[in-house]
Amino acid sequence: MKLTALHFYKYSEPFKSQIVTPKVTLTHRDCLFIELIDDKGNAYFGECNAFQTDWYDHETIASVKHVIEQWFEDNRNKSFETYEAALKLVDSLENTPAARATIVMALYQMFHVLPSFSVAYGATASGLSNKQLESLKATKPTRIKLKWTPQIMHQIRVLRELDFHFQLVIDANESLDRQDFTQLQLLAREQVLYIEEPFKDISMLDEVADGTIPPIALDEKATSLLDIINLIELYNVKVVVLKPFRLGGIDKVQTAIDTLKSHGAKVVIGGMYEYGLSRYFTAMLARKGDYPGDVTPAGYYFEQDVVAHSGILKEGRLEFRPPLVDITQLQPY
């Protein structure tokens, strides 16, 4: 098998409700897709999770495109016959995990039969608009992740009025400081499953007495398996959010899941406001998580998607089928 051609595509859809995070407000999701063609004419797609700007991570759509262009020129027409051999082709991309993850998503499909399956539904609420509340009422997720705002306690009270049981998670995106210690201590009374990344400087955890704030989860700092193990051994970290784009791809996450469980850590698979192709693989990995991952039903964030019926809500779970990318919706890039 050889790779003979590479095509780039752009796709953008408005969010049904703008995404309000501690770092940025998003109105649209711009996304890069790649299409790898093999010597038999088969096409395999990868969806990049990087954003247009570096608000979340230093890798952006433009930087990933540049890296993949160069990678393809270095590997065009090289022969490989196994998944393991294909992964050797991306050894040079260890320092650009978002680019590596995009390629690995396509390579994985060359050597694996993609299954149909179902997973628990884990919603993310950002800003808690009336439209989001109505969506939560209608879909009844197993887990709700609430993005931190100064109104966090009020928003939790609003969520507690919903007429179904759910696990509550808070995501702070490294935005808190010492002045937020009191709020964090109040959260400990709210049966919060865990809080993702409260502090930019993780050493601030040394200033907090054990048990006085919710359990801490790594997310932004979960950049490599070695770094993760070091942090869970140094600090009282119980949960790790694993994201393929941050670790370097599906294979890296699969290895990390097994290793971290052997260290006694709980694992969650994180999403990236994805379209249907990437959402399928996030859901596939989330089957091995200890808590519901960031997996939402088709139509939760966007009216349109390049993969139809990616995550159909049925009896409280999301059903996934092998994804088929509608290339007619993609714009050459």
UniProtKB/Swiss-Prot annotation:
It comes from the Bacteria. Gene3D superfamilies: Enolase-like C-terminal domain, Enolase-like, N-terminal domain. GO terms for molecular function: magnesium ion binding; O-succinylbenzoate synthase activity. Its EC number is 4.2.1.113. Its cofactor is a divalent metal cation. The active site is at K147, K243. The keyword NAD does not apply. Keywords: Lyase, Magnesium, Menaquinone biosynthesis, Metal-binding. Coiled coil: none annotated. Pathway: Quinol/quinone metabolism; 1,4-dihydroxy-2-naphthoate biosynthesis; 1,4-dihydroxy-2-naphthoate from chorismate: step 4/7; Quinol/quinone metabolism; menaquinone biosynthesis. It catalyses: (1R,6R)-6-hydroxy-2-succinyl-cyclohexa-2,4-diene-1-carboxylate = 2-succinylbenzoate + H2O. GO terms for biological process: menaquinone biosynthetic process. Mg(2+) binds at D171, E196, D219. Monomer. HAMAP family: MenC_2 (MF_01933). NCBIfam families: menC_lowGC_arch. Belongs to the mandelate racemase/muconate lactonizing enzyme family. MenC type 2 subfamily. Converts 2-succinyl-6-hydroxy-2,4-cyclohexadiene-1-carboxylate (SHCHC) to 2-succinylbenzoate (OSB). Does not show N-succinylamino acid racemase (NSAR) activity with N-succinyl-L-phenylglycine as substrate. This is o-succinylbenzoate synthase.
